[in-house]
Amino acid sequence: MAKKQNFIHGAAILTVGVIIMKLLGFIYKIPLGNILGDEGYSMFTSAYSIYFIFFTLATAGLPVALSRLIAEADANGRAKQEEKTFRVALATFAVIGVIFALILFLFPEWLAAKYLENPDAALSIKAMAPSILLVCLVSAYRGYCQGNGNMIPTTVDEVLEVLFKVISGLILASCLLKAGFGKPVGSAGAILGVSIGSVI
């Protein structure tokens, strides 16, 4: 009965968190579009589509699998196995994150021209490199927390990540454009907000 209540409580917390994140993401698009203009916003959305692909490849199913392994070890009282599983998962996530971050950082021009047909988005793609590494590492910790049945740290972390992404992205984009930098740099500044949000 207690486990069922904990599950319902955790699901409710996660649902509220998802709603808040969706609202923040929706609100974010309006001022960002006004700041960057059509040209800059096109670079941002193009680069973000590449980020989403790499994010999906880097984390697809892995946090869920980790949470199940952690939950099983925790239920059976195998603390050492739980710790070992987390260490292996963290190392795996780190390797995946480094590989994908290097691809984004070293080949942004090729990705922008080949897949986006928008060469001006190259700088924004490069700016995403730190974010994909940080997201991979954070995903391991989220899977660990979920496996232990504690949804509060995961939900709070995700909401704060989106909040700081919104704030830092808007500030960076606005400041860079006001300083006289072009739209590609302004778009890259908005993208850096994703990395800042991941650090938080």
Model-derived features: positions:
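N-terminal membrane topogenesis motif
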Residues: 1-24, 80, 84, 151
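Interfacial/gating helices of multi-pass transporter permease domains
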Residues: 32-53, 120, 183-192
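Transmembrane-helix boundary and interhelical linker motifs in polytopic inner-membrane proteins
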Residues: 37, 59-91, 147-152
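Small-residue-rich midsections of specific transmembrane alpha-helices
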Residues: 45-70, 130-133
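Short membrane-interface helical motifs at transmembrane helix boundaries
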Residues: 99-119, 177-178
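Alpha-helical transmembrane segments of multi-pass membrane proteins
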Residues: 117-141
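Membrane-interface junctions at transmembrane-helix termini in multi-pass inner-membrane proteins
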Residues: 135-157
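Hydrophobic alpha-helical transmembrane segments
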Residues: 157-171, 180-200
